[in-house]
A protein has these predicted regions:
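Helix-loop elements that line ligand-binding/catalytic pockets
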Residues: 239, 251-261, 278
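Carboxylate/His-rich catalytic cores and anion/metal-binding grooves
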Residues: 153-183
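Active-site-proximal alpha-helical scaffolds that flank and shape metal-associated catalytic sites
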Residues: 176-248, 272-283
Length: 380
């Protein structure tokens, strides 16, 4: 949908304010639906220009993707035993959920918890995280298939086709880990679902790129990086390393493609992309509040959300770092300061603008790549 005037925050988010607790506290209990349908407004485009390599950086990504494929069933050692509590409690500690703001504050829903409750929370929280990643990867699977259909460049179609395979593998590997090693699963968070629906529903192919390749995949890459850094569980560590090597290419695909597209856009068109980047950032912030976990732990979800929104700045580091790929990439694309710098102002308000000078993913993907020799060694 295009607009003639810049929209207000209320119009962008369809709620009273950025921190509307009632809206943010919405959560998805055990799911009823098995199939979720979203209308896809886009046209499928053929191109008769088959000139491979006319966009060299995309062609380089395509060639890299072809030799970087791995098998979720055979390239990971699924015989490794996993103790959920030992493996996952470190993520609760690293995300500052068990700090004084949650353990001692009089308004905290967890103020009376003992070790038993915190142990259960660690397992539930990690199961929720991996479940949301799995749902997000299915969203990426659908969105990338849409990019194959809608992008007008043959080099982009070629690369996007490899990403479809990557995303199928990611859904597969997260489901297998959840099923075999955790045994606890969660439905899709409504804030994530709303964002995925918006991305798929939009008719403009570059919005699919922005929503999925830059925003959703950018947050996932940052999250996987932090999880890989802190985990000592060997199966999860290797799984995340493989997934990160794919995700870095995916985000780079978005950056390299959109750089070209945005150069020729009008100020009005760029503002619409800024608004979407802001909306996506808020939706992802909202989904990080683990509404379904608090519900399963028997807490008042609205009170938990309200308490989570009031975390002191010093304890916000984990959530802020999840934007460590998004903000630099928006800067690289020129979205932060385009027009009157509206997106910079909004990212300042939600406390993530200081991440803008971290490395963007346009070329960074090479630092995450798994070389052919490493794959061969892993398989020997």
């Amino acid at each position: 949908m295009t607009t003639t005037e810049p929209r207000t925050e209320r119009e962008i988010l369809d709620r009273d304010s950025v921190d509307d607790v009632d809206a943010i506290a919405e959560f998805n209990p055990d799911p009823v639906e098995i199939i979720h349908a979203v209308e896809d407004q886009a046209e499928a485009l053929f191109t008769w220009d088959y000139s491979k390599g006319s966009r060299p950086r995309l062609d380089k990504l395509y060639e890299k993707a072809k030799v970087s494929q791995w098998n979720a069933q055979t390239d990971l050692d699924w015989s490794i035993e996993v103790d959920p509590l030992e493996a996952f409690s470190i993520f609760t500690e690293s995300s500052n959920v068990n700090t004084g703001h949650w353990t001692e504050h009089p308004d905290s829903p967890a103020k009376n918890w003992g070790d038993k409750e915190w142990d259960q929370f660690s397992i539930e929280s990690f199961a929720w995280r991996l479940s949301q990643f799995k749902h997000g990867e299915q969203g990426a699977l659908l969105c990338t298939a849409k990019i194959v259909e809608t992008v007008p460049w043959i080099d982009a179609k070629y690369y996007a086709a490899t990403q479809v395979v990557d995303e199928a593998r990611h859904v597969e590997v997260f489901e297998k880990y959840i099923d075999e090693k955790i045994g606890v699963r969660y439905p899709v968070n409504p804030h994530l679902q709303l964002l995925l629906d918006d991305i798929i529903n939009d008719s403009r192919w570059d919005m699919t790129y922005l929503g999925m390749q830059i925003m959703v995949e950018g947050l996932a890459l940052a999250a996987f990086g932090m999880m890989h850094q802190v985990t000592t569980e060997p199966l999860l560590k290797k799984l995340l390393r493989y997934v990160m090597s794919d995700e870095a290419r995916h985000v780079a695909f978005g950056v390299l493609s959109l750089q070209e597209v945005y150069q020729d856009m009008t100020a009005k068109e760029v503002r619409e992309r800024q608004e979407f980047a802001f909306e996506a950032g808020i939706r992802m912030r909202d989904r990080l509040l683990q509404q379904e976990v608090w519900d399963r732990m028997g807490c008042d979800v609205k009170k938990a959300v309200e308490h989570g929104l009031n975390i002191p700045d010093d304890d916000q580091i984990f959530n802020q770092l999840l934007f460590s790929k998004i903000v630099p990439n928006c800067r690289k694309l020129g979205l932060l300061d385009a027009g009157d710098g509206w997106l910079r102002e909004k990212y300042t308000e939600i406390g993530v603008i200081e991440l803008e000078h971290l490395e963007d993913t346009g070329e960074e993907y090479s630092t995450f790549s798994i070389e052919d020799e490493q794959l061969a060694t892993d398989r020997s």
